[in-house]
Amino acid sequence: RRKDGYTDMEEMQKDKVYGRDIFETRNLTFEPSVNLATPPNYRLGPGDEVIIDIWGTNQATIRDNVSPDGSITIPDLGLIYLNGMTIAEANQYLRKELNKIYAGLDNEQNPSSQIKVTLGNSRTIQVNVMGEVFQPGTYALSSFSTVFHALYRAGGVSDIGSLRNIQVVRGGQKIATVDVYDFIMKGKINDDIRLQEGDVIIVPPYEALVSIEGNVKRPMKYEMKNNESVATLLKYAGGFSGDAYTRSLRMIRQNGKEYQIYTIDDIDYSVFQD
């Protein structure tokens, strides 16, 4: 242990920004699993492979890719437009259409044949990752890809990029703001939305970095939001270590060339904002 109380490892850690290395971990790519069932809200688009299985009195398997105009071709029936439909919607629609050539499919009370529509190979989408990432650009991704996977492909968030205000723009409108800390701290993946063709991910610069040192479990730098308090910072840092004096702490705030020093009592931790 060094004279200043830190080990060499702790000294290196306290200069790091918490969460920034999540996209640098080789074994954590956030790549979508090909073995999962198709999400119920997944919408078919050009390039998706549609598999139609029919069994019972009638038996057939039909496979086709959705064309650029959003259709598949079914022998003896012609073009069927599926673009924008979920698998459930496509299943219902195809049941009625295929009943024209396979009798008994659309008899809900006692169908003599059954139909099941599944997704084969999924399409590739183009997504733009812009702003404070190491490798901004346009990426070809699986249509199951999420924001986190796109950020991983772009090399992760840069040294001045925000982990907590990542914006997703679709059709010129901001549709989501992603906070990586919600995933790291709480395991929440609600904000890690599935991407669509033409989506833009924008990583702006961070607004505030706060360094916490001394007897806490994770002495590091943390990106803080405007409404977060000292209590939140302590929570991010894992709380006080066993030998810490917990009744008060000292905060140094830089204002231009001047430094302001505050002593904060424990009763004010939840109201004093960084």
List each model region and its residues:
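Ser/Thr/Pro/Gly-biased, low-complexity, turn-/loop-rich segments
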Residues: 1-274
